[in-house]
């Protein structure tokens, strides 16, 4: 149980911008991270939902609510997922061979496809967040990060690993 709790704090420190007490890496708890990822999603979803309730409580304009709902998940994750989205958009948009796309993923420079993808993503989120600002579906804000992280965990657990992935190594 202690290792699972430590894995949760490790997961939060990696995938969330909320400060946590975990400062050390435990190699043996690495595989438990996949189980903890949906819990971090729940934490982010609750923050997102509470922010939406506060916006409605204070009667903020629909555009401001859209802006808040669009930006909260980025700030809660420390922009980690936006950075990853931009890297993948850049690699896929390059239409290059697999080896070159892997190089693009590792490159720290931002390419044109990354910028275009980022702008479209943020505009899309803003439009949908603004449209849903006074909707009864706001409770889904809790579920969306949980489901996305469940899918991510399942993908890491089931899909073939890249040779450079830490999960490609055999368990000790």
Predicted regions span which residues?
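Hydrophobic alpha-helical transmembrane segments
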Residues: 1-78, 93-102, 107-108, 113-172
